[in-house]
């Protein structure tokens, strides 16, 4: 076997369906569309979600809730990530977090969450902190500074 005689595995490919090419093909005349009706016409068919005139599901169900236009979206970082990456005494700010791949896109700022343990004294600068994160940072001898 070489590159000049490679063939697809048996049964892995199908011949394409040539429609409207005479009665002997099995798909001549109406080309598999049947007789008349909306689906036989060019551009025929119903739009997605159309239920034949019955009130569609989307309109039968009640509206619920809303999306706040003023919602703040923070990039989240946990203390366990800071523990693994940063050395004791270092300053953790937006640039340091970005260089180490902990945040990629910042919309409304960075929030530090308290998941994991911290035993290094770090100076952490962020837009928001959870209460548990502040407690753990200060217990380890570090500082939590709000930007």
From Swiss-Prot:
Biological process according to GO: translation
UniProt-listed Gene3D superfamilies: 3.100.10.10
SUPFAM superfamilies: Ribosomal proteins L15p and L18e
Ranges annotated as biased composition (Gly residues): 21-31, 42-52
Pfam families: Ribosomal_L27A
UniProt entry keywords in alphabetical sequence: Ribonucleoprotein, Ribosomal protein, RNA-binding, rRNA-binding
This protein's record includes keyword Ligase: no
Matches recorded under InterPro entries: Ribosomal_uL15 (IPR030878), Ribosomal_uL15/eL18 (IPR021131), Ribosomal_uL15/eL18_sf (IPR036227), Ribosomal_uL15_bac-type (IPR005749), Ribosomal_uL15_CS (IPR001196)
Example of a GO MF term: structural constituent of ribosome
GO cellular component: cytosolic large ribosomal subunit
Renumbered residue ranges of the record's region Disordered: 1-62
Keyword Ribonucleoprotein tagged: yes
Top-rank taxon: Bacteria
Function field: Binds to the 23S rRNA.
NCBIfam families assigned: rplO_bact (TIGR01071)
Record note on quaternary structure: Part of the 50S ribosomal subunit.
Family to which this protein belongs: Belongs to the universal ribosomal protein uL15 family.
Protein name per the record: Large ribosomal subunit protein uL15
Annotated gene: rplO
């Amino acid at each position: 076997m070489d590159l000049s005689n490679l063939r697809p595995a048996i049964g892995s490919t199908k011949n394409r369906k040539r429609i409207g090419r005479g009665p002997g093909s099995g798909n001549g005349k109406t080309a598999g569309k049947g007789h008349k009706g909306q689906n036989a016409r060019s551009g025929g068919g119903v739009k997605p979600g159309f239920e034949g005139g019955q009130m569609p599901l989307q309109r039968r169900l009640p509206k619920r809730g809303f999306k706040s236009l003023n919602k703040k979206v923070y990039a989240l970082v946990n203390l366990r990530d800071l523990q693994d990456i940063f050395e004791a005494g270092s300053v953790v700010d937006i640039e340091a977090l970005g260089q180490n791949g902990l945040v990629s896109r910042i919309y409304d700022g960075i929030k530090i969450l308290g998941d994991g343990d911290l035993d290094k004294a770090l100076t952490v600068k962020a837009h928001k902190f959870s209460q548990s994160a502040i407690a753990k940072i200060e217990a380890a001898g570090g500082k939590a500074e709000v930007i």
